Amino acid sequence: GAVTLNTTGATGHAEVDGGTTILDIAASTVGGNLSLTSGHATGITDSGTVTVGGNLIATNDVSNGDINMGSLAVDGTIALETSGSGGDVTLVNDVGLDFATSNIGGDLTGTATTGNISDSGTLTVTGATEITLGTTPTLTVTDVTSASVDGDTLIILDNSVFTGGIT
């Protein structure tokens, strides 16, 4: 079943290691940082809005395991880790996306509903990348060499489309 997490205050951190099971996070509010780990191919998912006042760290430590979180409200950075060419990540955040150091073995699909997308750490994606931004966003890659995307890249910016590689 789904796990509900609730903490208060900026120091109210939560850490969950689901072992080899699917980790489904129900509607939750974590005042501080949230760290999630799964070792299952279906991996980490959400079945309700997951609000995080600090940073989110999501790791799927099984080869080709996914992270699929479509109802995020993360105020801080997001760090992701998958392995294997099938280790895909899909994220939808209610504001911007600020990628901390992340290694994604498969594809990355990221949506910033109302905010900007940036990388405050090294973002490495082995597969294809699709980034969708809201209506008045900014895409900022502070150090071009820090964004390594080996697959195809598609960036959707207010109904305009950019395709190409980021190296």
Mark where each language-model region is.
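Extracellular lectin-like interaction modules
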Residues: G1-T167
